[in-house]
Amino acid sequence: MNADIDDVLALVRPDLQAFAGYSSARSAAVQGEVWLNANESAWANPADAAGNSRRYPEPQPLALREGLAALYGVTPPQLLIGRGSDEAIDLLVRALCVPGRDGVLVTPPVFGMYAVCARLQGAALIEVPLVDTEDGLRADLDAVIDTAKSRNAKLVFLCAPSNPAGSDIALDEIERVATALRGQALVVVDEAYVEYAQRPSAATLLAAHANLAVLRTLSKAHALAAARIGSLIAAPELIAVLRRCQAPYPVPTPCAELAVQALQPAGLARTAERVATVIAERERLFAALPGLPGVRRVYRSAGNYLLVRFADAQAAFDTLLAAGVVVRDQRAAPQLGDALRISIGSPEENDRVLAALSARRAAA
């Protein structure tokens, strides 16, 4: 084991570094024909026509793990599957942060689960706000590095592309943060929307930076939000520790089977087509929205959404809702008291957004 890996494993809570976790019946590497080791029913439920649900699922379904590893360009030992990215975020905070001692650094306004998990664990929440610039709401990475060092951050979450701001972080900048915080913090890059950013994943940096981890999901570009398939990509040694901290059966069999089918070539080709459509539609709305009544600013985005400031965000929200269009009200988020986040839908759905907001001019 090299020194970099030693440094990363030293970030794990001391009381969990030798933690064995729970050994489930399915985790035992045994073969047989009559399975009487897990107290399961010998008969399928009448509602289970295929008869596949009476057995517990694989803790980490092999076919899915291999398919995801191939998709993300990593090896299966580098990958942990969980119930969406949320579970991976929670696992990281619980496994690394000692309550009352360690901190979790975030860059608000940003995805709220980082803060939720930190507070549930009793970890200090350290905030380095995004900076509103001509190029958008962007992470101040110098401040991130300095604050992480001075405030004892154990985890640094970089949402790239950022939700809801839409700004991205270049790989060389991510690498700079990981290098600066080597030995002190795990830098976690949340790439839930990276398919829309048209850049390589930060997973390409893992070989050189053991204190880097990457979150991926099938919920967005791959259109499997209900299946709750998220992945954490990191050093195999860290993945092994987190696996011991994870619940025994995190991935239901029907969800795993659906995801495996989605990762076949035909499914991936269709996903790529739809991502291209979303990117084109995002640029169409980015160009059209600034000319509509009440729109103050539209932020350029690398995700499948646009952050929009309005002269009267409540009125804009109500106008869209009256037209049957539901968007995300961001006014409770820091710096976003006048903003809504609009997901990029189908061309027809996006036309309804533009028509509803344009109608405000006619009404005026």
From Swiss-Prot:
Biological process, per Gene Ontology: L-histidine biosynthetic process
The protein, known as: Histidinol-phosphate aminotransferase
Enzyme class, UniProt record, top EC level: transferase
Residue numbers of N6-(pyridoxal phosphate)lysine PTMs: K220
Family listed: Belongs to the class-II pyridoxal-phosphate-dependent aminotransferase family. Histidinol-phosphate aminotransferase subfamily.
InterPro entries to which the protein is assigned, alphabetical: Aminotransferase_I/II_large, HisP_aminotrans, PyrdxlP-dep_Trfase, PyrdxlP-dep_Trfase_major, PyrdxlP-dep_Trfase_small
EC numbers, comma separated: 2.6.1.9
CDD domains attached to this UniProt entry: AAT_like
Catalytic activity: L-histidinol phosphate + 2-oxoglutarate = 3-(imidazol-4-yl)-2-oxopropyl phosphate + L-glutamate
Spans through the membrane: none
GO molecular function: histidinol-phosphate transaminase activity; pyridoxal phosphate binding
Metabolic or biological pathway, per its Swiss-Prot or TrEMBL entry: Amino-acid biosynthesis; L-histidine biosynthesis; L-histidine from 5-phospho-alpha-D-ribose 1-diphosphate: step 7/9
Keyword tags: Amino-acid biosynthesis, Aminotransferase, Histidine biosynthesis, Pyridoxal phosphate, Transferase
Quaternary context: Homodimer.
Pfam families named in the record: Aminotran_1_2 (PF00155)
Cofactors demanded by this protein: pyridoxal 5'-phosphate
